[in-house]
């Protein structure tokens, strides 16, 4: 019986050591990933800013990523140009309103 306990303790020690090595490797990979994400986050376009040249570069809002919303602008000369800005689509606004209302009620 004593031999079985020693073998089980040895196996538990080996498994915990190998899993801690794996966790350390994962933490290093996550750190590199977070640093890369931070760099791309700095390049993101904030809400209400122009996104005409980068339509997929809008930031995240509270719950959803902002969408690049475009409109056609006609100048006094009659020239049409497309202007885009990062904003919250109406259905996302409705969802955020419902969630905010639910948080106030059930808080």
Swiss-Prot record:
**Which cysteines are disulphide-bonded?**
51-68, 58-86, 70-84
What InterPro entries does this protein's entry cite? Spider_toxin_CSTX_knottin (IPR019553)
Could you tell me one molecular function GO term of this UniProt entry? Answer: toxin activity
User: What compartments host this protein?
Assistant: Secreted
Is ATP-binding set as a keyword in this record? no
Question: What do the Gene Ontology cellular component annotations say?
Answer: extracellular region
Q: In which tissues is it expressed?
A: Expressed by the venom gland.
Any Pfam family matching the protein: Toxin_35
Report residue numbers covered by any propeptide: 21-41
Listed A to Z, the keywords are:
Disulfide bond, Secreted, Signal, Toxin
Give the residue range of the signal peptide: 1-20
The UniProt family comment states: Belongs to the neurotoxin 19 (CSTX) family. 04 (U1-Lctx) subfamily.
Official protein name in the record: U1-lycotoxin-Ls1g
Q: Which organism is it from?
A: Lycosa singoriensis (Wolf spider)
């Amino acid at each position: 019986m004593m031999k079985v306990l020693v073998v089980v303790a040895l196996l538990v020690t080996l498994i915990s050591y190998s899993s801690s090595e794996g966790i350390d490797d994962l933490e290093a990979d996550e750190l590199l990933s977070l640093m890369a994400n931070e760099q791309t986050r700095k390049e993101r376009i904030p809400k209400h800013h122009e996104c005409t040249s980068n339509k997929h570069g809008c930031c995240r809002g509270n719950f959803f990523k902002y969408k690049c919303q475009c409109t056609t602008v006609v100048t006094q000369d009659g020239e049409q140009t497309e202007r885009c800005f990062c904003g919250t689509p109406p259905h996302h606004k409705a969802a955020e309103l419902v969630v905010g209302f639910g948080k106030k009620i059930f808080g």
